[in-house]
Amino acid sequence: MAENPENENNYSASNIQVLEGLEAVRKRPAMYIGDISEKGLHHLINETVDNSIDEAMAGYCQNIEVTINEDNSITVEDDGRGIPVDMHEKLHKSALEVVMTVLHAGGKFDKGSYKVSGGLHGVGVSCVNALSTHMKSQVFRDGKIYQQEYEKGKPLYPVKVVGETDKTGTRQQFWPDPEIFTTTVYQWAIVARRMRELAYLNAGIKITLSDLRPDPETGKTRTEVFHAKDGLKEFVRYVDRHRQHLFDDVIYLKTEKQNIPIEVAVMYNTDYTENIHSYVNNINTIEGGTHLQGFRAALTRTLKTYADNDPQISKQLEKAKIEITGEDFREVLTAVISIKVAEPQFEGQTKTKLGNSEVSGAVQQAVGEALTDYLEEHPNEAKMICNKVILAATARVAARKARESVQRKNVMSGGGLPGKLADCSNKDPKDCEIFLVEGDSAGGSAKQGRDRYTQAILPLRGKILNVEKVQRHRVFEAESVMNIIQSIGVRFGVEGEGDFEANTDKLRYDKIIIMTDADVDGSHIDTLIMTLFYRYMPKVIEQGHLYIATPPLYKCTYKKVSEYCYTEQQRQAFIDKYANGVEDAKAIHTQRYKGLGEMNPEQLWETTMDPKTRLLKQVTIENAADADEIFSMLMGDDVEPRREFIEKNATYANIDA
């Protein structure tokens, strides 16, 4: 837990600083929460919980309860000090009302209240209030319960005392505005992922997540408690749980350099993929930044120095005629980096890349010292790491040769496109899209049904490579991978970039759409292809080019009325509407589509390919990471969690266990 310094305990209205008003939030919500779809909706929870986490980081809060209520409202309660309720000097209002109704108002802007804090651009809980039809704020402080309610950000009455209490803390309940958001239904998995993450990043804090909406099948509600006594040590084990470890130790450090608290946990495994998660003030810095640069520099320098000074390892390198690079040292590990910065400078509006220059040196020094000590104290593990690094370097050289072979054939290098590709006639990438279609028969229907001017088709024949289980050179030798790379125009080894950094400057299509059967095998192939892009071409995902098509599961017909149903719920709604909920084969004809090949070209166009009517799911780094994690488990070496997952998710994973 964080320190609880005496001089910071006087948390009152004088600590609440006001930077600007709330007016623009409802007019342009996406500017403040990213978007108004599912992601933005869930950010309302994150923003509210961040206030509680700030209290925890300052040393005043140990328990946070997050509840998804039956009506899809959210309640967040903590046992911190409670938002101040005394009068604000400048605004002559209760500090609680200021925090709840003024953008950029809060203790996080006053250094005496919080040394560091998270929160989306610091917009605070007032942003949540502005985007909710109704919100109720209760503060437990000084033996009293203070309360104020709001509609669309406006107070319904002044802050008032509604009871007495012997506890301290804050309880917030809000109802997201359906006029603002495209959906107001919260997803357990998304909320749970973030709560789990926060518990790992803040050792000792207990976060209880409850969902009071009865499960449609069992009728039960659910609760899960997230509590990590060992913080990042547990986090890195959790992230790496489906991989085979090189040795069981977690290399761990927790220190402070240049007034920057730094915490790092590292595990080595038998994979050939770099897996680094970095955080600043609890914010996932997906694009990395100066803290990641410092970590990588320390890793390369320290391990290279160790290898150069070890006669046995030096001899191995000389014999293999290989020069080790920084990426060889990183390919064999999973790491979690968490730092706290008082005034973080984030590049871009999404807080995904740290720009503070002073951080790099601090992290480099901390990691260099800790890793040097570990290697000296653990010579056997050090040799295991270096031997694995040599294997990674050997695989890298083989992969470069394989990649250069692909590059020679690549259209951007003057070669031809794959013979299976049915390209579109439009040559402006902004207007073009390519469908990666499972199987030749479906590929044939797609070729006939498409808009030939803007839509290209690449049938994927045979087995899609499981990139999680093979060395890198095998990936670049695989025909299915080669066909995708050639077709979409991704290039590797561009001058000035890393050997295996995917360059998308000459991407041939704006949308790359994975189109597979609407069954478990199709989901399996979706996951394989998503993992390929996540591991080897992440820029395609980051830039918003990767999508998944949604073919229908059923065609339901009642007399002359026909509807395509994409979910079981839509099919049931059709039955409810036309047959009073009774599935009568005489009244309603249901055609089940087991595969894309069962639809004729017109049906495939109408249901899955027509931009005016189709449903596309955009792949983000977050859901690609989920796919990667699922695949690490399904195709990993540990049988038991795989069996358990398949038993729980039989509709998703049709794989031999």
Residue locations for each model-derived region?
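GHKL-family ATPase ATP-binding module
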Residues: 1-15, 22, 44-46, 54-56, ...
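Conserved short strand/loop->alpha-helix "switch" segment adjacent to the catalytic nucleotide/phosphoryl-transfer site
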Residues: 27-45
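A short glycine-centered beta->alpha linker in the GHKL/HATPase_c
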Residues: 82-87
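Short adenine-binding "F-helix/F-box" segment of the Bergerat
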Residues: 88-89, 96
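Helical (often loop-to-helix) elements that flank the catalytic cores of nucleotide-handling enzymes
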Residues: 89, 347-360, 564-570, 574-578
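C-terminal interaction appendages of subunits in large macromolecular complexes
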Residues: 394-413, 428-433, 444, 448-450, ...
